[in-house]
Amino acid sequence: MTQRIAITPGEPAGVGPDLIITIAQQDWPVEMVVIASKALLQERSKALSLPLTIIDYDQHAPAKSQKSGSLTVLDVELTEPCVPGTLNSANGSYVVETLRIASEKNISGEFDAIVTGPVHKGLINKAGIAFSGHTEYFATQANCSDVVMMLATKGLRVALVTTHIPLAYVSKAITYERLQKVTRILHKDLQEKFGIKSPKIYACGINPHAGEDGHLGREEIEIMEPAFAELRADGIDIIGPLPADTIFQEKYLAEADAILAMYHDQGLPVLKYKGFGSSVNITLGLPFIRTSVDHGTALELAGKGTADSGSFIEAMNNAINLASNK
């Protein structure tokens, strides 16, 4: 059966629409249903001088693989016309509406996965809509109290205990309960979505040198080690906490199915250095599959045909592979 993958371009003034039109210039073994403004896609394809045939989405028709130069589109009107590279807060509600439709139709089983383009969080909030990120939004839509943000590239997966919070709040956010929940979700999805029978997880400490026996902080001793001990007792193979400045050595990465980082800028700089342009964001713990690009809106590139589509292609391929494991 042909898979049906929902795609949201994200910020209309950014490179999301460009990338979708670019990757549509090849055949795909799935139906790519873009939840977006048809007019926006048509205008952007002309700006890029790329051919585009739009097929109106019919949920009652059987899914068909996507042919080169075509996109299936579920039309959502822009609030106001869009100029590439120029933000307009009036379209913040449009962006959120595309995400709402995508999540609802994935929860219902109409789609097999969601692939999301980059959004501008500040603009959505400026529009009066509280929004801290895709991960948190989809968790709310799916009524999930706990989800996990993981980024992946060739040879490295990094999951985060905390995501989009100020660094000053990180230490208090890393609790015994949070470590338990995040690690269990990571372990479960590595098994069920990635087909890894016995996942091995390496965990970073939070302090320099993982606290150095409590001399540089006691979170490792008082919170992390007891949490990991209970996880091991339940059969979860987790190693750590280890110093974050040494955990990314090849000798560890060769064994690790995932690295568990305590905060956003502890784990992601290494991953993006290793695979920028070819890494993908994956949300774990949702009742549906969601992948995304690993970059921002790149407003300065919108409509110019110079944006790199590598991460979007990886996000698509990961979504297809994960959906095949369901």
UniProtKB/Swiss-Prot annotation:
Its EC number is 1.1.1.262. GO terms for biological process: pyridoxal phosphate biosynthetic process; pyridoxine biosynthetic process. Disulfide bonds: none annotated. It is found in: Cytoplasm. SUPFAM superfamilies: Isocitrate/Isopropylmalate dehydrogenase-like (SSF53659). Pathway: Cofactor biosynthesis; pyridoxine 5'-phosphate biosynthesis; pyridoxine 5'-phosphate from D-erythrose 4-phosphate: step 4/5. A divalent metal cation binds at H164, H209, H264. One of its GO terms (molecular function) is cobalt ion binding. Keywords: Cobalt, Cytoplasm, Magnesium, Metal-binding, NAD, NADP, Oxidoreductase, Pyridoxine biosynthesis, Zinc. Binds 1 divalent metal cation per subunit. Can use ions such as Zn(2+), Mg(2+) or Co(2+). One of its GO terms (cellular component) is cytoplasm. Its cofactor is Zn(2+); Mg(2+); Co(2+). Its main location: cytoplasm. It catalyses: 4-(phosphooxy)-L-threonine + NAD(+) = 3-amino-2-oxopropyl phosphate + CO2 + NADH. Substrate binds at H134, T135, K272, N281, R290. Pfam families: PdxA. Homodimer. Catalyzes the NAD(P)-dependent oxidation of 4-(phosphooxy)-L-threonine (HTP) into 2-amino-3-oxo-4-(phosphooxy)butyric acid which spontaneously decarboxylates to form 3-amino-2-oxopropyl phosphate (AHAP). The active site is located at the dimer interface. HAMAP family: PdxA. Belongs to the PdxA family. This is 4-hydroxythreonine-4-phosphate dehydrogenase. It comes from Colwellia psychrerythraea (strain 34H / ATCC BAA-681) (Vibrio psychroerythus).
